[in-house]
């Protein structure tokens, strides 16, 4: 299958070619997002489209895992934010999440995802599209309005702690000689896993971890 069929990141120019010429046109990519969702349990595919502060457009999808309860699923918003982190984005500006099976209604994220978004730097400024199929345009509402009387990282973390999508280094290392442990730019899978772990966000448990995988075609993935 064509690689573009599994495309989750669009430059501003690529997004424009898909009809995303201004914020209200983010839904033009929701069909692509929903087609990539994996919902074998509920059959309810959710897509999310977000614009990062850099101007690039990202897709997110829900992922359900057969044999496990639904609370182990990855929500589309969480998928999208992880996508931002893996691409070294500094923040999320706009977000559109479908709440209907036909992809024509857009609403606020679930309570779990609203709290998850609070882990991002300047989260309260994130604008979320609210639109029903009966509205021509809809409107953007800030997370500040959608999550009143909120709990935030500032309530528990030390002042100045790096938040999600902010630069961080967990100061982890692997045992071995200098020749065996290189850098995140080398071809060693363990070095890529170490780099992922050093960028891991786990401020409440202090248990950072990372993983790197390589497929049969030589492509590698990290998280």
From Swiss-Prot:
Its cofactor is Zn(2+). GO terms for cellular component: cytoplasm. Binds 1 zinc ion per subunit. It comes from the Eukaryota. It catalyses: cytidine + H2O + H(+) = uridine + NH4(+); 2'-deoxycytidine + H2O + H(+) = 2'-deoxyuridine + NH4(+). InterPro entries: APOBEC/CMP_deaminase_Zn-bd (IPR016192), CMP_dCMP_dom (IPR002125), Cyd/dCyd_deaminase_Zn-bd (IPR013171), Cyt/Deoxycyt_deaminase (IPR050202), Cyt_deam_dimer (IPR006263), Cytidine_deaminase-like (IPR016193). Residues 21-154, 184-223 form the CMP/dCMP-type deaminase domain. Its EC number is 3.5.4.5. Keywords: Hydrolase, Metal-binding, Zinc. It is an enzyme of class 3 (hydrolase). Zn(2+) binds at residues 75, 110, 113. SUPFAM superfamilies: Cytidine deaminase-like. GO terms for molecular function: cytidine deaminase activity; identical protein binding; zinc ion binding. The active site is at 77 (proton donor). GO terms for biological process: cytidine deamination. Substrate binds at residues 62-64. Coiled coil: none annotated. This enzyme scavenges exogenous and endogenous cytidine and 2'-deoxycytidine for UMP synthesis. Belongs to the cytidine and deoxycytidylate deaminase family. Homodimer. This is Cytidine deaminase 3. The lineage of its organism: Eukaryota, Viridiplantae, Streptophyta, Embryophyta, Tracheophyta.
